[in-house]
Design a protein with these regions (language model features):
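Loop/turn elements at helix/coil->beta-strand transitions in domains of secreted/extracellular proteins
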Residues: 66-69, 97-99, 129
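Thiol-based oxidoreductase modules, predominantly thioredoxin-like and allied folds used
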Residues: 73, 84-92, 96-111, 118
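C-type cytochrome heme c attachment motif
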Residues: 76-83, 123
């Protein structure tokens, strides 16, 4: 009876370890999906390391990324933001090798929104790999996004 109990306990431990390894594997697959053209939701800490550390560089714009990006300041309750969201998701996939698309929920990241003076949403930052960003307010059409991406972010005519 004791051996049967020990065997059962070992089986339970092995099952837990294998489930834990599976969960870690799923996380890394999700991380790869983000790198392959998904829209990435940022918090303040992520923004400071991936986009612009305004606490360290208060007088000069220094982009922290290596690919051009779009940053969408949005809210879940915002109608125009809901129109822009699927367009950005589609563009993140279409331009997955060229740009990164980020989203920042202004209700969750009030300090970050205040740092950029966000007063209306959606507000979009178009950030080239080198140079200063451009800002756009309001819902843009897919054609307007494509124009901004190609001409401003990627420098195509």
């Amino acid at each position: 009876m004791r051996k049967l109990k020990d065997l059962f306990m070992i089986s339970v431990v092995l099952l837990l370890v294998s489930c834990s390894m599976s969960a870690k594997s799923d996380k890394s697959e999700t991380g790869n999906a983000v790198a392959q053209g998904e829209v990435v939701v940022l918090n303040k800490a992520d923004f400071l390391t991936k986009v612009y550390n305004y606490e360290k560089n208060q007088t000069e714009w220094v982009y922290e990324g290596n690919k051009p990006c779009i940053v969408d300041f949005y809210a879940d309750w915002c109608g125009p933001c809901k129109k822009v969201s699927p367009i950005l998701k589609e563009l993140a996939g279409e331009y997955k090798n060229d740009i990164i698309v980020y989203k920042i929920n202004v209700d969750n990241e009030k300090e970050l929104a205040a740092a950029f003076g966000i007063q209306s949403i959606p507000t979009l930052l178009f950030i080239p790999a080198k140079g200063k960003p451009q800002i756009a307010q309001g819902a843009l059409s897919k054609e307007q996004f494509v124009e901004q991406i190609n001409s401003f972010l990627l420098g195509k005519k």
